[in-house]
């Protein structure tokens, strides 16, 4: 099950479209979805989460809490819409393109991909590109 919660005025234009894509990605990685909760919020909401649970005091675009077991993905993904807007301007990307990348990045973390080392970053970036390509070419939706 995939749930979407909104702590901001923003709402996804088509939750079904995103859910179908996420299910596709997860199945391609030979995993299953138990429960994924996407919480869209603002910077203040997310920095409070960052402070409270991670003891960090800076803005970020996404925080993922992983409760997955074996092949069953279970997690909460908090996404700052304001940070996505900021980063889309900074990186000269369309807002929804940046949002899709952040969403799939978080899902890949739940699947088990890491991005601490350069080789891990490279692999994760390539996976993001592949799954964004599938979405863009409408192989998924």
Swiss-Prot record:
Entry keyword annotation includes Hydrolase: yes
Family matches, as InterPro entries: MetalPrtase_cat_dom_sf_prd, YbeY, YbeY_CS
Top-level division of the source organism's lineage: Bacteria
One BP annotation, GO: rRNA processing
Cofactor(s) needed: Zn(2+)
Chief location of this protein within or outside the cell: cytoplasm
Molecular function, one GO term: RNA endonuclease activity
GO terms for cellular component: cytoplasm
Pfam families xref list: YbeY (PF02130)
EC number, as in UniProt: 3.1.-.-
UniProt keyword list: Cytoplasm, Endonuclease, Hydrolase, Metal-binding, Nuclease, Ribosome biogenesis, rRNA processing, Zinc
Compartments (UniProt record): Cytoplasm
UniProt xrefs under PROSITE patterns: UPF0054 (PS01306)
Cofactor binding mode and count: Binds 1 zinc ion.
Positions contributing to Zn(2+) binding: 105, 109, 115
Family statement: Belongs to the endoribonuclease YbeY family.
HAMAP family: Endoribonucl_YbeY
Function: Single strand-specific metallo-endoribonuclease involved in late-stage 70S ribosome quality control and in maturation of the 3' terminus of the 16S rRNA.
Protein name listed in UniProt: Endoribonuclease YbeY
Organism annotation: Karelsulcia muelleri (strain GWSS)
Lineage, opening ranks: Bacteria, Pseudomonadati, Bacteroidota, Flavobacteriia, Flavobacteriales
């Amino acid at each position: 099950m995939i749930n979407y919660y909104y702590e901001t005025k923003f709402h996804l234009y088509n939750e079904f479209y995103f859910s179908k894509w996420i299910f596709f990605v997860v199945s391609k990685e030979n995993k299953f979805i138990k429960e994924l909760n996407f919480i869209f919020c603002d910077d203040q909401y997310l920095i409070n989460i960052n402070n409270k649970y991670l003891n960090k005091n800076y803005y970020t675009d996404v925080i993922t809490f992983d409760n997955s077991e074996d092949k069953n993905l279970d997690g909460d993904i908090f996404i700052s819409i304001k940070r996505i807007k900021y980063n889309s301007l900074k990186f000269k990307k369309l807002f929804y393109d940046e949002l899709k990348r952040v969403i799939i990045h978080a899902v890949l973390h739940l699947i088990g991909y890491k991005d601490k080392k350069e080789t891990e970053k490279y692999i994760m970036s390539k996976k993001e590109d592949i799954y964004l390509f599938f979405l863009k070419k409408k192989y998924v939706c």
